[in-house]
Regions:
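Short linear interaction motifs
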Residues: 50-69, 186-195, 199, 250-262
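Extended, H/D-rich, highly charged conserved domains that either
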Residues: 95, 100, 116, 120-156, ...
Length: 475
Protein backbone atom coordinates (compact mmCIF):
# COMPACT_ATOMS: atom_id res chain seq x y z
CA UNK A 1 0.00 0.00 0.00
CA UNK A 2 2.85 2.35 0.89
CA UNK A 3 4.56 1.78 -2.48
CA UNK A 4 1.31 2.51 -4.33
CA UNK A 5 0.90 5.81 -2.50
CA UNK A 6 4.45 7.04 -3.03
CA UNK A 7 4.02 8.32 -6.58
CA UNK A 8 4.90 12.00 -6.15
CA UNK A 9 8.14 13.56 -4.88
CA UNK A 10 6.37 14.83 -1.76
CA UNK A 11 5.06 11.35 -0.93
CA UNK A 12 8.43 9.70 -1.55
CA UNK A 13 10.19 12.16 0.76
CA UNK A 14 7.49 11.79 3.41
CA UNK A 15 7.96 8.00 3.33
CA UNK A 16 11.74 8.37 3.91
CA UNK A 17 12.58 7.83 0.25
CA UNK A 18 14.91 9.94 -1.88
CA UNK A 19 14.59 12.33 -4.81
CA UNK A 20 17.62 12.80 -7.05
CA UNK A 21 18.45 14.78 -10.18
CA UNK A 22 22.07 15.00 -11.33
CA UNK A 23 24.16 15.06 -14.49
CA UNK A 24 21.93 14.57 -17.56
CA UNK A 25 18.72 13.67 -15.72
CA UNK A 26 15.84 15.48 -17.35
CA UNK A 27 13.39 14.98 -14.50
CA UNK A 28 13.37 14.09 -10.82
CA UNK A 29 14.16 10.42 -10.14
CA UNK A 30 12.08 9.01 -7.28
CA UNK A 31 13.54 6.19 -5.19
CA UNK A 32 11.58 4.66 -2.33
CA UNK A 33 12.82 3.60 1.09
CA UNK A 34 13.76 0.12 -0.19
CA UNK A 35 15.86 1.52 -3.04
CA UNK A 36 13.38 0.82 -5.83
CA UNK A 37 13.02 3.43 -8.58
CA UNK A 38 9.41 4.62 -8.56
CA UNK A 39 9.57 6.11 -12.07
CA UNK A 40 12.04 3.87 -13.97
CA UNK A 41 10.92 5.26 -17.33
CA UNK A 42 12.54 8.57 -16.33
CA UNK A 43 15.80 7.02 -15.13
CA UNK A 44 18.49 6.32 -17.74
CA UNK A 45 21.16 5.05 -15.33
CA UNK A 46 19.27 2.05 -13.91
CA UNK A 47 18.41 -0.03 -16.99
CA UNK A 48 17.60 -3.06 -14.84
CA UNK A 49 15.17 -1.96 -12.16
CA UNK A 50 15.23 -5.35 -10.45
CA UNK A 51 18.25 -4.23 -8.43
CA UNK A 52 17.99 -1.74 -5.60
CA UNK A 53 19.77 1.59 -5.62
CA UNK A 54 22.20 1.56 -2.68
CA UNK A 55 24.86 3.96 -1.44
CA UNK A 56 27.44 2.64 -3.91
CA UNK A 57 25.17 3.41 -6.85
CA UNK A 58 24.35 6.82 -5.41
CA UNK A 59 28.05 7.53 -4.88
CA UNK A 60 29.03 6.65 -8.44
CA UNK A 61 26.32 9.01 -9.63
CA UNK A 62 26.77 11.90 -7.19
CA UNK A 63 30.40 12.21 -6.05
CA UNK A 64 32.04 12.77 -9.48
CA UNK A 65 29.30 15.25 -10.38
CA UNK A 66 29.73 17.29 -7.19
CA UNK A 67 33.52 17.12 -7.50
CA UNK A 68 33.23 18.66 -10.95
CA UNK A 69 30.82 21.38 -9.80
CA UNK A 70 33.01 22.25 -6.82
CA UNK A 71 35.76 23.22 -9.27
CA UNK A 72 33.66 26.11 -10.56
CA UNK A 73 35.33 29.48 -10.61
CA UNK A 74 32.94 30.74 -7.93
CA UNK A 75 31.67 28.34 -5.24
CA UNK A 76 29.17 29.27 -2.53
CA UNK A 77 27.44 27.36 0.27
CA UNK A 78 24.09 28.37 1.78
CA UNK A 79 23.21 26.65 5.07
CA UNK A 80 19.82 26.79 6.74
CA UNK A 81 18.54 25.45 10.03
CA UNK A 82 18.92 21.90 8.72
CA UNK A 83 22.65 21.84 9.45
CA UNK A 84 22.05 22.77 13.10
CA UNK A 85 19.35 20.10 13.31
CA UNK A 86 21.66 17.47 11.80
CA UNK A 87 24.56 18.19 14.17
CA UNK A 88 22.25 18.47 17.19
CA UNK A 89 20.74 15.06 16.43
CA UNK A 90 24.19 13.52 16.21
CA UNK A 91 25.37 15.20 19.42
CA UNK A 92 22.42 14.80 21.79
CA UNK A 93 19.52 13.28 19.89
CA UNK A 94 17.28 16.35 19.61
CA UNK A 95 16.74 18.85 16.82
CA UNK A 96 17.70 22.01 18.74
CA UNK A 97 15.92 25.37 18.72
CA UNK A 98 13.25 25.79 16.06
CA UNK A 99 11.28 28.81 14.88
CA UNK A 100 8.12 27.80 16.73
CA UNK A 101 5.14 30.10 17.09
CA UNK A 102 5.01 32.47 20.03
CA UNK A 103 1.96 33.97 21.68
CA UNK A 104 1.57 37.67 22.38
CA UNK A 105 -0.75 38.74 25.17
CA UNK A 106 -0.97 42.26 23.74
CA UNK A 107 -2.72 42.66 20.37
CA UNK A 108 -2.76 38.89 19.95
CA UNK A 109 -5.52 38.79 17.31
CA UNK A 110 -4.21 41.75 15.32
CA UNK A 111 -0.67 40.36 15.20
CA UNK A 112 -1.95 36.89 14.29
CA UNK A 113 -4.07 38.19 11.41
CA UNK A 114 -1.19 40.25 10.01
CA UNK A 115 1.20 37.29 10.30
CA UNK A 116 -1.19 35.00 8.42
CA UNK A 117 -1.63 37.57 5.66
CA UNK A 118 2.14 38.04 5.37
CA UNK A 119 2.75 34.29 5.21
CA UNK A 120 0.13 33.75 2.51
CA UNK A 121 1.53 36.64 0.47
CA UNK A 122 4.92 34.91 0.46
CA UNK A 123 3.43 31.54 -0.49
CA UNK A 124 3.56 29.88 2.93
CA UNK A 125 0.67 28.21 4.71
CA UNK A 126 1.47 29.73 8.10
CA UNK A 127 3.85 32.24 9.61
CA UNK A 128 6.73 31.61 11.99
CA UNK A 129 8.38 33.43 14.84
CA UNK A 130 10.29 35.76 12.52
CA UNK A 131 7.00 36.89 10.97
CA UNK A 132 5.53 37.48 14.42
CA UNK A 133 8.50 39.54 15.61
CA UNK A 134 8.51 41.58 12.41
CA UNK A 135 4.80 42.38 12.68
CA UNK A 136 5.16 43.20 16.38
CA UNK A 137 8.05 45.56 15.56
CA UNK A 138 5.96 47.37 12.97
CA UNK A 139 3.07 47.63 15.42
CA UNK A 140 5.37 48.91 18.16
CA UNK A 141 6.72 51.70 15.96
CA UNK A 142 3.18 52.69 15.01
CA UNK A 143 2.08 52.80 18.65
CA UNK A 144 5.08 54.97 19.53
CA UNK A 145 4.21 57.38 16.73
CA UNK A 146 0.66 57.63 18.08
CA UNK A 147 1.90 58.01 21.64
CA UNK A 148 -0.19 55.03 22.72
CA UNK A 149 0.47 53.90 26.30
CA UNK A 150 0.23 50.25 25.20
CA UNK A 151 3.56 50.68 23.41
CA UNK A 152 5.38 50.17 26.72
CA UNK A 153 3.61 46.86 27.38
CA UNK A 154 4.29 45.56 23.88
CA UNK A 155 7.95 46.59 24.08
CA UNK A 156 8.37 44.77 27.39
CA UNK A 157 6.78 41.66 25.92
CA UNK A 158 9.05 41.81 22.88
CA UNK A 159 12.05 42.13 25.18
CA UNK A 160 11.00 39.00 27.07
CA UNK A 161 10.33 37.01 23.89
CA UNK A 162 13.67 37.86 22.27
CA UNK A 163 15.54 37.20 25.52
CA UNK A 164 13.93 33.78 25.80
CA UNK A 165 14.73 33.03 22.16
CA UNK A 166 18.37 34.03 22.61
CA UNK A 167 18.54 31.85 25.72
CA UNK A 168 17.10 28.89 23.81
CA UNK A 169 19.73 29.34 21.08
CA UNK A 170 22.48 29.36 23.70
CA UNK A 171 20.92 26.29 25.28
CA UNK A 172 21.09 24.43 21.96
CA UNK A 173 24.75 25.39 21.61
CA UNK A 174 25.40 24.25 25.18
CA UNK A 175 23.72 20.88 24.61
CA UNK A 176 26.14 20.23 21.75
CA UNK A 177 29.15 21.40 23.75
CA UNK A 178 28.39 19.28 26.84
CA UNK A 179 27.12 16.13 25.11
CA UNK A 180 28.94 12.85 25.73
CA UNK A 181 32.46 12.84 24.35
CA UNK A 182 31.96 10.12 21.75
CA UNK A 183 28.76 11.65 20.37
CA UNK A 184 30.22 15.16 20.43
CA UNK A 185 33.34 14.05 18.56
CA UNK A 186 31.21 12.22 16.00
CA UNK A 187 29.06 15.32 15.47
CA UNK A 188 32.06 17.64 15.19
CA UNK A 189 33.79 15.21 12.82
CA UNK A 190 30.79 15.27 10.49
CA UNK A 191 30.67 19.07 10.64
CA UNK A 192 34.40 19.43 9.99
CA UNK A 193 34.37 17.05 7.02
CA UNK A 194 31.30 18.79 5.63
CA UNK A 195 32.92 22.23 5.74
CA UNK A 196 36.30 21.00 4.48
CA UNK A 197 34.65 19.38 1.45
CA UNK A 198 33.73 22.89 0.33
CA UNK A 199 36.66 24.88 1.70
CA UNK A 200 39.40 22.59 0.32
CA UNK A 201 40.07 24.74 -2.72
CA UNK A 202 43.53 25.53 -3.99
CA UNK A 203 44.79 28.98 -3.18
CA UNK A 204 44.61 30.20 -6.78
CA UNK A 205 40.82 29.69 -6.88
CA UNK A 206 38.38 32.22 -5.50
CA UNK A 207 37.49 31.75 -1.87
CA UNK A 208 34.49 29.74 -0.79
CA UNK A 209 31.57 31.97 0.20
CA UNK A 210 29.52 30.63 3.13
CA UNK A 211 26.05 32.06 3.71
CA UNK A 212 23.73 31.07 6.52
CA UNK A 213 20.33 32.11 7.83
CA UNK A 214 21.13 30.71 11.28
CA UNK A 215 21.65 32.85 14.38
CA UNK A 216 23.80 30.30 16.22
CA UNK A 217 27.59 29.98 15.87
CA UNK A 218 27.80 26.32 14.87
CA UNK A 219 29.46 27.01 11.51
CA UNK A 220 32.02 29.27 13.19
CA UNK A 221 32.84 26.54 15.71
CA UNK A 222 33.17 23.95 12.95
CA UNK A 223 35.48 26.22 10.97
CA UNK A 224 37.60 26.83 14.06
CA UNK A 225 37.96 23.11 14.70
CA UNK A 226 38.76 22.48 11.03
CA UNK A 227 41.39 25.22 10.92
CA UNK A 228 39.45 27.26 8.36
CA UNK A 229 40.07 31.01 8.43
CA UNK A 230 36.77 32.90 8.20
CA UNK A 231 36.57 36.46 6.90
CA UNK A 232 33.55 38.74 7.24
CA UNK A 233 32.63 42.42 7.36
CA UNK A 234 33.76 42.92 10.96
CA UNK A 235 36.98 44.75 11.80
CA UNK A 236 38.76 44.62 15.14
CA UNK A 237 39.73 42.16 17.84
CA UNK A 238 38.21 42.97 21.25
CA UNK A 239 34.78 44.07 20.05
CA UNK A 240 34.79 44.04 16.21
CA UNK A 241 32.76 46.67 14.36
CA UNK A 242 30.61 45.91 11.31
CA UNK A 243 32.04 47.54 8.19
CA UNK A 244 29.53 48.85 5.64
CA UNK A 245 32.08 48.94 2.82
CA UNK A 246 32.94 45.63 1.20
CA UNK A 247 36.71 45.28 0.84
CA UNK A 248 38.09 42.15 -0.77
CA UNK A 249 40.68 41.44 1.90
CA UNK A 250 42.53 38.13 1.74
CA UNK A 251 45.23 36.13 3.50
CA UNK A 252 48.67 35.47 1.99
CA UNK A 253 51.96 34.02 3.17
CA UNK A 254 55.58 34.28 2.06
CA UNK A 255 57.19 30.92 1.22
CA UNK A 256 60.50 30.30 3.03
CA UNK A 257 63.43 31.74 1.13
CA UNK A 258 61.22 33.63 -1.35
CA UNK A 259 60.62 37.36 -0.98
CA UNK A 260 58.18 39.49 -2.90
CA UNK A 261 56.08 36.56 -4.11
CA UNK A 262 53.29 36.07 -1.55
CA UNK A 263 50.99 33.10 -2.12
CA UNK A 264 47.35 32.64 -1.22
CA UNK A 265 46.79 30.79 2.03
CA UNK A 266 44.67 27.65 1.68
CA UNK A 267 41.69 26.93 3.92
CA UNK A 268 40.19 30.43 3.80
CA UNK A 269 36.48 31.21 3.38
CA UNK A 270 34.19 34.22 3.57
CA UNK A 271 31.10 34.02 5.79
CA UNK A 272 27.92 36.08 5.71
CA UNK A 273 25.14 35.62 8.27
CA UNK A 274 22.15 36.86 6.31
CA UNK A 275 19.74 37.11 9.25
CA UNK A 276 22.22 38.39 11.80
CA UNK A 277 23.79 36.55 14.68
CA UNK A 278 23.33 35.87 18.35
CA UNK A 279 26.51 37.79 19.19
CA UNK A 280 25.77 40.91 17.10
CA UNK A 281 24.63 43.93 19.11
CA UNK A 282 23.65 47.43 18.07
CA UNK A 283 25.45 49.99 20.20
CA UNK A 284 24.80 53.61 19.36
CA UNK A 285 25.25 53.98 15.63
CA UNK A 286 27.42 50.89 15.28
CA UNK A 287 26.99 47.14 15.14
CA UNK A 288 29.48 45.18 17.21
CA UNK A 289 30.25 41.52 17.71
CA UNK A 290 30.58 40.70 21.39
CA UNK A 291 32.72 37.96 22.91
CA UNK A 292 29.88 35.57 23.69
CA UNK A 293 31.18 32.04 24.43
CA UNK A 294 29.65 29.13 22.54
CA UNK A 295 26.86 27.74 24.73
CA UNK A 296 27.00 30.44 27.43
CA UNK A 297 24.34 30.06 30.12
CA UNK A 298 23.03 33.61 29.80
CA UNK A 299 23.59 36.46 27.37
CA UNK A 300 22.78 39.34 29.73
CA UNK A 301 26.18 39.54 31.51
CA UNK A 302 27.90 40.02 28.15
CA UNK A 303 25.57 42.89 27.25
CA UNK A 304 26.67 44.83 30.33
CA UNK A 305 30.21 45.38 29.07
CA UNK A 306 31.50 48.98 29.01
CA UNK A 307 31.02 50.58 25.62
CA UNK A 308 27.74 48.88 24.75
CA UNK A 309 25.73 51.83 26.11
CA UNK A 310 22.89 50.04 27.83
CA UNK A 311 22.40 47.28 25.28
CA UNK A 312 19.74 44.68 26.01
CA UNK A 313 17.98 41.85 24.18
CA UNK A 314 16.12 44.34 21.98
CA UNK A 315 19.49 45.46 20.61
CA UNK A 316 20.46 41.98 19.42
CA UNK A 317 20.80 41.90 15.66
CA UNK A 318 18.39 39.03 15.10
CA UNK A 319 16.43 39.47 11.89
CA UNK A 320 13.99 41.11 11.90
CA UNK A 321 15.76 43.07 14.61
CA UNK A 322 13.96 45.17 17.18
CA UNK A 323 16.62 47.87 17.34
CA UNK A 324 15.39 49.79 14.34
CA UNK A 325 16.18 53.31 15.44
CA UNK A 326 18.28 53.90 12.34
CA UNK A 327 16.98 55.84 9.37
CA UNK A 328 17.67 52.74 7.30
CA UNK A 329 15.43 50.15 8.96
CA UNK A 330 17.00 47.26 7.03
CA UNK A 331 20.58 47.98 8.14
CA UNK A 332 22.75 45.86 8.05
CA UNK A 333 20.68 43.26 6.21
CA UNK A 334 20.69 45.19 2.93
CA UNK A 335 24.49 44.96 2.88
CA UNK A 336 24.41 41.26 3.71
CA UNK A 337 21.93 40.40 0.96
CA UNK A 338 23.95 42.53 -1.44
CA UNK A 339 26.95 40.32 -0.63
CA UNK A 340 24.85 37.25 -1.48
CA UNK A 341 23.80 38.65 -4.84
CA UNK A 342 27.31 39.86 -5.70
CA UNK A 343 28.81 36.46 -4.87
CA UNK A 344 26.46 34.10 -6.69
CA UNK A 345 25.07 36.13 -9.60
CA UNK A 346 28.19 35.70 -11.73
CA UNK A 347 29.11 33.46 -14.66
CA UNK A 348 30.57 30.04 -13.80
CA UNK A 349 29.13 30.17 -10.30
CA UNK A 350 27.88 27.17 -8.30
CA UNK A 351 25.72 27.47 -5.19
CA UNK A 352 25.05 24.52 -2.89
CA UNK A 353 22.23 24.77 -0.36
CA UNK A 354 22.06 22.44 2.62
CA UNK A 355 19.24 22.42 5.15
CA UNK A 356 17.62 25.50 3.61
CA UNK A 357 13.85 25.14 3.21
CA UNK A 358 13.40 28.03 0.72
CA UNK A 359 11.19 29.89 3.17
CA UNK A 360 12.85 33.28 2.64
CA UNK A 361 11.55 35.11 -0.42
CA UNK A 362 14.43 37.61 -0.35
CA UNK A 363 16.92 34.78 -0.83
CA UNK A 364 14.74 32.92 -3.33
CA UNK A 365 14.59 35.97 -5.59
CA UNK A 366 18.38 36.18 -5.62
CA UNK A 367 18.61 32.47 -6.47
CA UNK A 368 16.14 32.93 -9.31
CA UNK A 369 18.21 35.83 -10.64
CA UNK A 370 21.35 33.70 -10.45
CA UNK A 371 19.80 30.99 -12.62
CA UNK A 372 19.16 33.49 -15.43
CA UNK A 373 22.93 33.29 -16.08
CA UNK A 374 23.38 30.14 -18.23
CA UNK A 375 26.72 29.04 -16.73
CA UNK A 376 25.49 29.01 -13.12
CA UNK A 377 24.34 25.91 -11.24
CA UNK A 378 22.26 25.35 -8.12
CA UNK A 379 22.64 22.19 -6.02
CA UNK A 380 19.88 21.63 -3.46
CA UNK A 381 20.64 19.14 -0.67
CA UNK A 382 18.11 18.57 2.08
CA UNK A 383 16.94 15.83 4.44
CA UNK A 384 13.28 16.65 3.75
CA UNK A 385 10.95 19.35 2.47
CA UNK A 386 8.67 20.03 5.47
CA UNK A 387 6.93 23.13 4.11
CA UNK A 388 7.01 22.09 0.46
CA UNK A 389 8.94 25.16 -0.65
CA UNK A 390 11.94 23.34 -2.16
CA UNK A 391 9.93 21.33 -4.68
CA UNK A 392 7.74 24.38 -5.32
CA UNK A 393 10.82 26.45 -6.19
CA UNK A 394 12.05 23.70 -8.50
CA UNK A 395 8.71 23.16 -10.24
CA UNK A 396 8.21 26.89 -10.86
CA UNK A 397 11.74 27.46 -12.17
CA UNK A 398 12.34 27.76 -15.89
CA UNK A 399 15.98 26.71 -15.44
CA UNK A 400 15.68 23.10 -14.29
CA UNK A 401 18.70 22.05 -16.37
CA UNK A 402 20.84 24.25 -14.12
CA UNK A 403 19.66 22.54 -10.95
CA UNK A 404 20.71 19.35 -9.16
CA UNK A 405 18.43 17.90 -6.48
CA UNK A 406 19.42 15.62 -3.59
CA UNK A 407 16.55 15.30 -1.11
CA UNK A 408 15.79 12.44 1.23
CA UNK A 409 16.61 10.56 4.40
CA UNK A 410 19.67 9.01 2.73
CA UNK A 411 20.91 11.74 0.41
CA UNK A 412 20.36 14.54 2.93
CA UNK A 413 21.87 12.77 5.93
CA UNK A 414 25.04 14.65 6.85
CA UNK A 415 26.86 11.44 7.83
CA UNK A 416 26.15 9.83 4.45
CA UNK A 417 27.05 13.05 2.68
CA UNK A 418 30.48 13.36 4.26
CA UNK A 419 31.21 9.65 3.97
CA UNK A 420 29.98 8.84 0.46
CA UNK A 421 28.70 11.74 -1.62
CA UNK A 422 30.70 14.91 -1.05
CA UNK A 423 34.19 15.34 -2.55
CA UNK A 424 37.23 14.54 -0.44
CA UNK A 425 37.67 16.93 2.47
CA UNK A 426 41.22 17.70 1.36
CA UNK A 427 43.07 19.22 -1.57
CA UNK A 428 43.78 15.93 -3.34
CA UNK A 429 46.61 16.80 -5.70
CA UNK A 430 47.82 13.19 -5.71
CA UNK A 431 44.64 11.88 -7.35
CA UNK A 432 44.68 14.71 -9.88
CA UNK A 433 48.31 14.03 -10.78
CA UNK A 434 47.63 10.29 -11.09
CA UNK A 435 44.67 10.88 -13.40
CA UNK A 436 46.74 13.19 -15.61
CA UNK A 437 49.64 10.73 -15.70
CA UNK A 438 47.34 7.88 -16.70
CA UNK A 439 45.79 9.96 -19.44
CA UNK A 440 49.17 11.06 -20.77
CA UNK A 441 50.58 7.53 -20.67
CA UNK A 442 47.63 5.55 -21.91
CA UNK A 443 45.97 8.11 -24.13
CA UNK A 444 42.61 7.41 -22.48
CA UNK A 445 40.55 9.16 -19.84
CA UNK A 446 40.96 7.93 -16.31
CA UNK A 447 38.06 6.15 -14.67
CA UNK A 448 38.98 7.32 -11.17
CA UNK A 449 35.85 9.44 -10.95
CA UNK A 450 33.67 6.41 -11.67
CA UNK A 451 35.24 3.31 -10.12
CA UNK A 452 32.25 1.13 -10.95
CA UNK A 453 33.22 1.15 -14.65
CA UNK A 454 36.12 -1.22 -15.43
CA UNK A 455 39.06 0.40 -17.11
CA UNK A 456 39.58 -0.41 -20.79
CA UNK A 457 43.30 0.21 -21.21
CA UNK A 458 45.24 -0.69 -24.29
CA UNK A 459 48.86 -1.80 -23.86
CA UNK A 460 51.03 1.25 -23.55
CA UNK A 461 53.47 1.93 -26.38
CA UNK A 462 55.22 4.68 -24.45
CA UNK A 463 58.93 3.94 -24.05
CA UNK A 464 60.84 4.47 -20.81
CA UNK A 465 62.40 7.78 -21.81
CA UNK A 466 59.03 9.21 -22.76
CA UNK A 467 57.61 8.02 -19.45
CA UNK A 468 60.38 9.75 -17.55
CA UNK A 469 59.73 12.89 -19.56
CA UNK A 470 56.06 12.86 -18.57
CA UNK A 471 56.90 12.37 -14.89
CA UNK A 472 59.42 15.21 -15.00
CA UNK A 473 56.92 17.52 -16.68
CA UNK A 474 54.31 16.66 -14.06
CA UNK A 475 56.64 17.33 -11.18
Amino acid sequence: MEEQQAKTPQEVIKNKGNVIKTRDDRELILIDLKGKVVNPEKCSWTPNNSETVNNSVFRSRIEPWLTSLFQSEHLSLLCGSGITTAISLLAYGKSGTTMEDITFSNYKDEIGAAVDASAKASGREKGNMEDQIRVANDLLRGLKVLGDENAVKLEEELHTIITNFATSLLSSEKEIAISSEDKRENAYRALINFLLSFASRTGNKERLNIFTTNYDRLIEVGAELAGIHLMDRFVGTIMPIFRSSRLNLDLHYNPPGIRGEPRYLEGVARITKLHGSLDWVQSGGEIRRIGLPFGAANINPYLEAPGLQGADALKLMIYPNSAKDRETAEYPYVELFRDLAASICRPNSTLVTYGYGFGDEHINRVLSDMLTIPSTHLVIISYDDPIGRILKFYSESAHKDQMSILIGANLGDITNLTKDYLPKSAIDRATIRMAELLQNRMGVASNIANPTIPAQIEPSTTNESATEEIINSES
